[in-house]
From Swiss-Prot:
<dbReference type="GO" id="GO:0005737">
    <property type="term" value="C:cytoplasm"/>
</dbReference>
<keyword id="KW-0648">Protein biosynthesis</keyword>
<keyword id="KW-0711">Selenium</keyword>
<dbReference type="GO" id="GO:0001717">
    <property type="term" value="P:conversion of seryl-tRNAsec to selenocys-tRNAsec"/>
</dbReference>
<dbReference type="InterPro" id="IPR015421">
    <property type="entry name" value="PyrdxlP-dep_Trfase_major"/>
</dbReference>
<dbReference type="GO" id="GO:0001514">
    <property type="term" value="P:selenocysteine incorporation"/>
</dbReference>
<dbReference type="InterPro" id="IPR015424">
    <property type="entry name" value="PyrdxlP-dep_Trfase"/>
</dbReference>
<dbReference type="InterPro" id="IPR018319">
    <property type="entry name" value="SelA-like"/>
</dbReference>
<keyword id="KW-0663">Pyridoxal phosphate</keyword>
<comment type="similarity">
    <text>Belongs to the SelA family.</text>
</comment>
<comment type="pathway">
    <text>Aminoacyl-tRNA biosynthesis; selenocysteinyl-tRNA(Sec) biosynthesis; selenocysteinyl-tRNA(Sec) from L-seryl-tRNA(Sec) (bacterial route): step 1/1.</text>
</comment>
<keyword id="KW-0963">Cytoplasm</keyword>
<dbReference type="Pfam" id="PF03841">
    <property type="entry name" value="SelA"/>
</dbReference>
<feature type="modified residue" description="N6-(pyridoxal phosphate)lysine">
    <location>
        <position position="221"/>
    </location>
</feature>
<dbReference type="InterPro" id="IPR004534">
    <property type="entry name" value="SelA_trans"/>
</dbReference>
<dbReference type="GO" id="GO:0004125">
    <property type="term" value="F:L-seryl-tRNA(Sec) selenium transferase activity"/>
</dbReference>
<protein>
    <recommendedName>
        <fullName>L-seryl-tRNA(Sec) selenium transferase</fullName>
        <ecNumber>2.9.1.1</ecNumber>
    </recommendedName>
</protein>
Amino acid sequence: MAKETLEITPDLLKNPYQKIINASASVFDEKHGRSFFSTQFYEKIEPYLKEVLTHPIDLECDLNTAKKKNRLTPLKQLFKACFNTEEILIVNNNTSAIFLIANALAQEKEIIVSYGELVGGDFNLKDILLNSGARLHLVGNINRAYLRDYRLALNENSKILFKTHNPHFKKDTPFKDLQTLAKEHDLIDYYNLGDVDLSNRVALEEILALKPSLLSFSADKFFNSAQAGIIMGQKERVEALKNHPLYRVLRVGKITLTLLFCSLKAWINHQEDITIHALLNQTKDALLQKALKLYALLKPLELNVSIASSFSKIGNLFGRELESFCVKIQPKNTRALNSEKLYLKLFQKGVIARISCEFVCFEVFSLNEKDFEKIALVLEEILNKA
């Protein structure tokens, strides 16, 4: 039977992704492309980005010596100066960082990790570690892990004491205690900051001050940058990762490196046009004012409209809630258009809301004034056609 030939139609040539209005409860969500730049920030970096994208560049050639150089060298110097770390490595996301560390340094060896740090959210850290070729030795329970649990787990196959950032543990073992234990037994102490509390830049600096063997985190969320995983730590450990064949599979290209440089530069200078910082530093009063503005635009429409307290969250970061407000709507004529149909029609127009108890809810946390106007126009159009 002959295979059907797929024709190249105009629809296939349309831009595959389009901008959306994120009125959902999830900020920097995987489904929405995670972090994004502010317009002001993009306008600042656009000339340099254009230069990198439209010309050959010195990615791996040293213009001073005419020899080959490491593509990470310029960024390495900036990271070292900024965070006082011995060495860094950049891979395509933090999951890659975790996998590379486990595969390169603990192949067929044991990683000792608290059971409670492997659960929560949508991201299955346990599967990543098991598929790396390392073995897991779980200690503690869902919300408690004591130092004695780690000590009792030690054996001749132990290689890494692994800790994942989890501020909601009821009984947490301080990382510095794990470091002491690791040094006593010549093990690697590894701290996975992952999607750390993004409103608190001190978290990274506090862990770095402890000088862990290895540390990794998500650059796109921490620096509001392109998706990347940053590995920092002891030169010996990072060099072992860099020389591993898997690193070449996971390394990043010139666009990611350029965007990461620009984002880190802005982060160092505390620039206010970093989207993450602007959103996460919103006051409760500012969020209420946003809700009132959207309420005023929607009230004249054929809708029941109200404001309610709510919570947003950062992507799939478990347990981190952001106080906010939502504007709840319900069509007055539910026979012609119920809330489920309205939710779907909004979704099809690129307005991502949520539905709860027969109401469509617009979370205001990620919205701006242009979004309010667009939501009102889309709703008016939908109601007129109902």
